[in-house]
From Swiss-Prot:
Residues 1-21 are annotated as: Disordered. PANTHER family: ANAPHASE-PROMOTING COMPLEX 10, ANAPHASE-PROMOTING COMPLEX SUBUNIT 10. It holds the Pfam family ANAPC10. InterPro entries: APC10/Doc1, APC_su10/DOC_dom, Galactose-bd-like_sf. One of its GO terms (cellular component) is anaphase-promoting complex. This is Anaphase-promoting complex subunit 10. One of its GO terms (biological process) is anaphase-promoting complex-dependent catabolic process.
């Protein structure tokens, strides 16, 4: 993993161009790998834990219970390619509980996390896409991700996050042999069929 990028990004997507992480999944460009990880939180109110972040219901949410920063830890059993993180928030419903500044960190464990980027959110409603990059590479390979809520809107203390999805690029696309045409020599033609 290269040195941290420390880049600030501001996200305020207009409602008409709302991101949809499921669209890319349905097209087969990415796959959701959050189910392959162990999730933990820095704190939560009873009944508003990590299961609410992963239930695919936009009306439920994780609610923290403690001092900032609030942390979502995502640990994979093996090094995993990650290309994007999607976070669903709703400023209209959550107001001061809505994150306004988040940090994305990556590493092999809690002791060597490096900040990849910091993102400012301005009254976000809907899916917020966070591209995960390491320099010019469009994805990273990591054992652990950490999403840290650094501050909330209106100086709120606790935070609400409604959903989180973790995307990995689809590897090993298979192409039909017809794209390559017919073999022209006898040496290659003997490999054209399987007995």
């Amino acid at each position: 993993m290269a040195a941290s990028m420390d880049e600030d990004i501001t996200a305020n997507p207009p409602p008409s161009s709302e991101e949809d992480p499921l669209a890319e999944e349905r097209l087969g460009f990415v796959r959701e790998v959050g189910a392959q990880a162990v999730w933990s939180l820095s704190s939560c109110k009873p009944g508003f834990g990590v299961e609410r972040l992963r239930d695919n219901i936009m009306d439920t949410y994780w609610q923290s219970d403690g001092q900032l920063p609030h942390l979502v830890n995502i640990q994979f059993h093996k090094r995993t390619n990650i290309s994007q993180i999607y976070i669903y928030t709703d400023y209209k419903l959550d107001e001061s509980y809505t994150p306004s500044r988040i940090s994305i960190r990556s590493g092999t464990n809690f002791n060597d996390l490096q900040e990849l980027q910091v993102m400012d959110l301005t009254e976000p409603t809907g899916w917020v896409q966070i591209p995960i990059k390491d320099g010019n590479v469009k994805s990273i390979r990591t054992f652990m991700l950490q999403i840290a809520v650094i501050s909330n809107h209106q100086n709120g203390r606790d935070t609400h996050m409604r959903q989180i999805r973790i995307h990995a690029p689809v590897e090993g696309k298979h192409y039909p042999l017809e794209l390559f045409g017919k073999f022209g020599t006898v040496d290659f033609q003997k490999f054209a069929t399987i007995r």
